[in-house]
């Protein structure tokens, strides 16, 4: 098992490395808004690049950030930060960034997908690096304002200047990540592990596990409302325990009956066949097959995603969950 021996913090980073440089943040969604505001509040020169004037444009202005059309934002930028969705980045790069960017400008990413799978091929004279916060944009902003920060990953793809790591850590400091800690990785490792996590547990795995457990109980004649509470609703409480106290803390917090049942039946359900399928899923990611299929799917208007989402929305568990929302919310304590 490989492990990093280095975690970068505030003492390893210096904002002076990028002071005076113009930073163009492309996109003003969840991450873009948080990054732009945090970098601005850290005393850095930030503009936002958007493809069109609309809600994001007006929101940036109301936040005190200068919005520009992407072409105008990148032409004078020393550092260009891609914070638009993965599948938008290649078109944005080809049409609005590459033809207009300044020679030698840095390219920064929050996810390695487009670089790792060569959907974007950067100029040879640009530093290319990644800062990947391990939390959603609103949390990145909230923690920064409170004096904290969300941990992040850092990776260097091209280091033409010899100072790419220093600049990457300065960006990380600017968004507050070095207050917590920044772990070195590679574009390859970040991309493959991120996709794997999404597919086998965070989205795909947990969704299918909840669905299978719920449907098993209902098919055996149990009330769907009771099945929903036992297989879906209670998951949040346990995930919160894992987040706060780790897996050991979660196991210690549940009943002895739950401990025994979980430790015996858990391995029966998540068996070697499941682990084998996980490795197969990982190989699809590593080989580039998943990326190839996803690019094709996106180009066709995402029919698999649209159809799958429709099935989820029309499922019994979703209907029961919607019916129980009022009941669940009713029991929550009122905020003072």
UniProtKB/Swiss-Prot annotation:
Keywords: Amino-acid biosynthesis, Branched-chain amino acid biosynthesis, Magnesium, Metal-binding, NADP, Oxidoreductase. Its EC number is 1.1.1.86. Binds 2 magnesium ions per subunit. Residues 5-185 form the KARI N-terminal Rossmann domain. One of its GO terms (biological process) is isoleucine biosynthetic process. It comes from the Archaea. Substrate binds at residue 255. The keyword Lipid metabolism does not apply. Residues 186-331 form the KARI C-terminal knotted domain. PROSITE patterns: KARI_C (PS51851), KARI_N (PS51850). InterPro entries: 6-PGluconate_DH-like_C_sf (IPR008927), KARI (IPR013023), KARI_C (IPR000506), KARI_N (IPR013116), KARI_prok (IPR014359), NAD(P)-bd_dom_sf (IPR036291). It catalyses: (2R)-2,3-dihydroxy-3-methylbutanoate + NADP(+) = (2S)-2-acetolactate + NADPH + H(+); (2R,3R)-2,3-dihydroxy-3-methylpentanoate + NADP(+) = (S)-2-ethyl-2-hydroxy-3-oxobutanoate + NADPH + H(+). The active site is at 111. NADP(+) binds at residues 28-31, 56, 86-89, 137. The keyword RNA-binding does not apply. One of its GO terms (molecular function) is magnesium ion binding. Involved in the biosynthesis of branched-chain amino acids (BCAA). Catalyzes an alkyl-migration followed by a ketol-acid reduction of (S)-2-acetolactate (S2AL) to yield (R)-2,3-dihydroxy-isovalerate. In the isomerase reaction, S2AL is rearranged via a Mg-dependent methyl migration to produce 3-hydroxy-3-methyl-2-ketobutyrate (HMKB). In the reductase reaction, this 2-ketoacid undergoes a metal-dependent reduction by NADPH to yield (R)-2,3-dihydroxy-isovalerate. Belongs to the ketol-acid reductoisomerase family. This is Ketol-acid reductoisomerase (NADP(+)). It comes from Saccharolobus islandicus (strain Y.N.15.51 / Yellowstone #2) (Sulfolobus islandicus).
């Amino acid at each position: 098992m490989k492990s990093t021996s280095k975690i970068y913090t505030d003492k390893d980073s210096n904002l002076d490395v990028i002071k005076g440089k113009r930073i163009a943040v492309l996109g003003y969604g969840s991450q873009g808004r948080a990054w732009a505001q945090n970098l601005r509040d850290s005393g850095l020169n930030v503009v936002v690049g958007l493809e069109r004037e609309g809600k994001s444009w007006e929101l940036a202005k109301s936040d005190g950030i200068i919005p520009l059309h992407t072409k105008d934002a990148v032409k004078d930028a020393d550092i260009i930060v891609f914070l638009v969705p993965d599948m938008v980045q290649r078109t944005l790069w080809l049409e609005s960034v590459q033809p207009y960017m300044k020679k030698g400008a840095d390219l920064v990413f929050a996810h390695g997908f487009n670089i790792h799978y060569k959907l974007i091929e950067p100029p040879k004279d640009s530093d290319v690096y990644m800062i990947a916060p391990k939390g959603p944009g609103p949390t990145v902003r909230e923690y920064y304002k409170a004096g904290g920060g969300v941990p992040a990953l850092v990776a260097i793809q091209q280091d033409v200047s010899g100072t790419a790591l220093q600049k990457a850590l300065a960006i990380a400091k600017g968004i507050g990540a070095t207050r917590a800690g920044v772990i070195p990785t590679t574009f390859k490792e970040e991309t493959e592990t991120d996709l794997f996590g999404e597919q086998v547990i965070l989205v795909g795995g947990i969704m299918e596990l909840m669905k299978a457990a719920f449907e098993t109980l209902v098919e055996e004649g149990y009330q769907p409302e009771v099945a929903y509470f036992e297989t879906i609703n209670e998951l949040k409480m346990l995930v919160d325990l894992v987040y706060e106290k780790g897996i050991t803390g979660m196991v210690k917090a549940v009943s002895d009956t739950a401990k025994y049942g979980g430790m015996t039946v858990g391995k029966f359900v998540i068996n070697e066949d499941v682990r084998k399928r996980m490795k197969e899923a990982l190989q699809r990611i590593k080989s580039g097959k998943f990326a190839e299929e996803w690019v094709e799917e996106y180009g066709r208007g995402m029919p698999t995603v649209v159809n799958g989402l429709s099935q989820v929305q029309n499922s019994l568990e979703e209907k029961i969950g919607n019916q129980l929302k009022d009941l669940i919310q009713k029991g929550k304590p009122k905020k003072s």
